[in-house]
Amino acid sequence: MLTLNSPVTPLDKPLPASWLLLPGVVPLVSRRQAIGSTPAVLAEVLQDEVNLGLWQRRLPAHIADFGELLLSLNQPLAESLALDLPDEEALPNLQGLASGFSDLHGYDGFIADASWLVSAFACLLGAKRVGLRLRVLDKAMCPRFHVDHVPVRLITTYAGIGSQWLREGAMDRRQLGQASAEPRDPTLIQQIGSGEVALFKGEKWHGNQGFGLIHRSPQPAPGERRLILTLDWLG
């Protein structure tokens, strides 16, 4: 049985009071982001005041190599699975996932890693059904800052640039989706590293209405792509 509930010390540092005086910045509200170097930090997303759990991990070299090799082939990839996990001991059936790339170095390690993430996600939430999507993207799928209308979503980028997000107060939530309202100061835009694992709490998490994590897809540079995996709680 997987467990993510070992003690965690949040790494966030309070923002200076002068930060609130920046033009266009609205006052902070009672939400924070939990960031750490072990998977246990992901469990902090269960706390009411947390809308992001971010595990700042470094991918094993063979898994990182797999992602880079896959992207180098310049082939399309868009796969979805609905995975049933009837009990805590059930293992996700990832047979066939990215099977067209199974001859690449690191494929088995990638599958093992994805399987662990599914199991950990299900264990943390008590989920019996998990939706998995694996995609190669050459452009920003959701280029404007927005919130997800789901309870919680796991996202990790195996190769390429990672997702971007905002701390509370960096943008007026009433203007989400409007390009003119997005932060102009690049220091206000946070970037998730390749290989890191994030849990984004959305608007449909009980008690989190109006506080879903604000984020967007990054725009890859011309000729660049990204390999991204997402998990959703289906039941």
Language model feature labels by segment:
Residues 2-98, 108-116:
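N-terminal auxiliary "cap/dimerization" subdomain that precedes the catalytic jelly-roll/cupin core
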Residues 39, 140-143, 213-216:
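Glycine-rich, charged/polar anion/phosphate-binding loops
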Residues 49-52, 151-154, 195, 225-226:
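Short, surface-exposed beta-edge/turn micro-motifs
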Residues 63-65, 165-167, 201, 208-209:
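Short helix/loop capping segments that flank catalytic or ligand/cofactor-binding pockets
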Residues 92-139, 147:
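Extracellular-facing segments of soluble proteins and assemblies that are Gly/Ser/Thr-biased and enriched
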Residues 114, 134-136, 156-168, 217, ...:
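Active-site environment of non-heme Fe oxygenases that use a 2-His-1-carboxylate facial triad
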Residues 139-196:
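Catalytic core of non-heme Fe(II) oxygenases with the double-stranded beta-helix
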Residues 183-235:
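Catalytic core of Fe(II)/2-oxoglutarate
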